[in-house]
Every structure is written in C-alpha cells, then in structure tokens.
C-alpha cells in the first residue's frame, strides 16, 4: 500500500551495480538481518556494508563469512551523527532497519515501545537530510486476529505490545513520507518467517524450528488443540529477496511479505515427517493464550505490483531446504 508521494525515477540495483553502494543493516546479526546481510554481500560484492547490532537478539556466528564493518551499539541511544558524521557526507544509499525487540511475550510495555519506536525515530532523523532510502521491518502482527488474507489497507488491531510498537512505526513512516514525497520509505510486514540462523532466538524461534527439534529427538511434536490453526509460513530466503527488491521501489509504501498461502500446523507436521523420515503423530494440548492469532495469510497483490515480489518456496520446498541446512548429511 503506497504511503503517498510522487514516483522517484530511481533504481537502486541498476544504479549501484557499477559503483560501490553503501548500506547499513540494523539488527544484522539477528535471524532475518544476518540472512539479508550475507545476501547483500553476495549480490553487491563491492558494497560497503555496516551492521549495527547490540546482540540482544543476535549472534556473531550468524555472520560467518561477513566482510563488512560492525558497530556494537544500542539503537535506542545511538547518536547517528556522532558515529557516522553528517548524513550528506556519509553517503549511505539505503538503511535496512531490522533491529527491534521481537519477543511477543515481553510484557514490559515501556521497554518494548521505547526501544522499537525511538530507535526508528532516531534513524529517520539521521536519514532525513539526505533522504536516504529506508527499508524497515514492520510486522504481520499489526493485523491482529484475522479470518482471511490480510490486506495492507486493513485497520491495525495489535494484540500485544510488540505489534503496537510496529503500528506506531508505520504511523511515523507514513508521516515522514507525506512530509517528504521524494523520500522513499518502505515498510515490510513479514509474516511467519522460518529458516537458517534462528536457533539463537530460543523460545521466539519459529514453530518449524521447535517442532523439528522435538521430532529429530524422537518426540511427538506438541501443538495446540487440534492443530488446525493456520499460518502463512514464509521461508527466510523469500523475505530476504523481497527486502532487496524494495531497493527498486519507486514510491514509499507498506507491503506484505509472505507466501500468500495459509497452512495448518497439522499440515506442517506432515511435511516435517516427510523431510525428517519420521512418522510421529501430534500431541495436542490446550492453548493457554487469551490473545492468539489462529489464522495468518498475506495478500500479496500490492507487493507483486510495487516490488515485483514473487515467493519461490512453498512450505514443502522451504522446509526441505531448511532441514538440509539444519541437519546436514554426514
């Protein structure tokens, strides 16, 4: 969904392949951030990359093979000008903002909203003079409970403080884009992402990771009764590709990144059994959560039109690729 503003006749990937682009990736040691960082390094081998991460939800091991710079700072207190100098002189082509407190079970409202929102505000204040392109992680959690595919124009209904912080970030992005129509700010609502380099997250790691670990150990996979809750499970390689495609967006906007398909947890366990060579039946238990998304699915119409985003991995293909990475053949 466009945020407003006029087209910017600008193609990042076309204009930077002949030069040495400069990118910042906040949260670049985290799950999605590290996958994005290494993909940018592969796509733009001459790029100057700078990762900013405080390791609160990241791990240095995720950046094996990384050749760029690294800044260990808390974004909620980072003085961007002191660290990088005048934004016009710094000359960054784009800032990918993926850093945030992502644990939806955290109940400290001040910490989560302050860190997520103020980090974003500080980043925008630094980027504003040069109108550096911003590509930031919003979230499908902003939609709250849904019964059908979520469209970007749907009203926000955050069910937890994490989702609320992302709604506020979206509001701030809309305001900044409206004030500066030639400044490209792209928000990406990632759906239920899974894939390599998420293990360090612990409890907030994807259900695909946790269920695979249970099944690999020979245990029945434990899911809420009766396994018919559905998710738009999207492989991290697809959301990374969508994030890079945002470098070519001609207007500001907020877009869904998922597969466009909702699959049940029972279906997921069938897929895992096939990939792992197991035959384990689910162990169902009561859902203790009062606010729980029983259904998520991305409407990809806007992302296809604006970003030319097209997911490549079905649940079967993504889980197979992930299991081969997670449990390599000996």
Please place each PLM-identified region on the residue numbering.
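Active-site loop immediately N-terminal to the catalytic Tyr-X3-Lys motif
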Residues: 108-109, 200-201, 250
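A structural alpha-helix within SAM-dependent methyltransferase catalytic domains
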Residues: 41, 124-128, 174, 212, ...
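N-terminal Rossmann-like NAD(P)+-binding domain of SDR-like oxidoreductases, especially those catalyzing
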Residues: 9-191
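Short glycine/proline- and charge-enriched loop/turn segments
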Residues: 149-156, 194, 284-286, 299-302
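NAD(P)-dependent short-chain dehydrogenase/reductase
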Residues: 148, 161, 171-231, 236-241, ...
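C-terminal substrate-binding subdomain of Rossmann-fold SDR/epimerase-dehydratase oxidoreductases
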Residues: 10, 215-330
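N-terminal amphipathic/basic-hydrophobic helices that include classical n-h-c signal peptides
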Residues: 1-11
């Amino acid at each position: 969904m466009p945020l407003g503003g006029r087209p910017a006749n600008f193609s990042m990937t076309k204009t930077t392949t002949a030069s040495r682009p400069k990118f910042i990736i906040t949260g670049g040691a985290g799950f999605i951030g590290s996958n994005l960082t290494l993909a940018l390094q592969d796509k733009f081998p001459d790029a100057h990359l700078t990762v900013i991460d405080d390791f609160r939800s990241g791990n240095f091991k995720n950046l094996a093979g990384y050749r760029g710079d690294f800044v260990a700072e808390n974004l909620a207190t980072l003085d961007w000008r002191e660290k990088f100098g005048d934004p016009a002189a710094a000359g960054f082509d784009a800032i990918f903002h993926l850093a945030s407190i992502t644990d939806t079970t955290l109940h400290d409202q001040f910490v989560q909203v302050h860190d997520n929102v103020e980090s974003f505000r500080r980043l925008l204040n630094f980027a504003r003079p040069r109108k550096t392109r911003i590509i930031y992680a919003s979230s499908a959690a902003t939609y709250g409970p849904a019964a059908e595919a979520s469209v970007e124009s749907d009203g926000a209904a955050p069910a937890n403080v994490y989702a609320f912080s992302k709604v506020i970030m979206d509001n701030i992005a809309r305001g900044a884009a409206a004030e500066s129509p030639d400044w490209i700010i792209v928000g990406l609502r990632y759906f239920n992402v899974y894939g390599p380099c998420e293990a360090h997250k612990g409890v907030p790691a994807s259900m695909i990771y946790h269920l695979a670990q249970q099944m690999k150990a020979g245990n029945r996979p434990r899911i809420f009764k009766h396994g018919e809750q559905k998710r738009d499970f999207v492989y991290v390689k697809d959301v990374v590709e969508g994030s890079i495609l945002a470098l070519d967006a001609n207007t500001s906007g907020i877009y869904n990144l998922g597969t466009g398909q909702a699959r049940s947890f029972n279906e997921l366990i069938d897929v895992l059994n096939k990939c792992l060579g197991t035959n384990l039946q689910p162990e169902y238990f009561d859902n203790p959560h009062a606010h729980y998304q029983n259904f998520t699915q991305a409407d990809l119409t806007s992302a296809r039109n604006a970003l030319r985003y097209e997911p490549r991995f079905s649940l079967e293909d993504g889980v197979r690729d992930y299991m081969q990475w997670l449990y390599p053949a000996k």
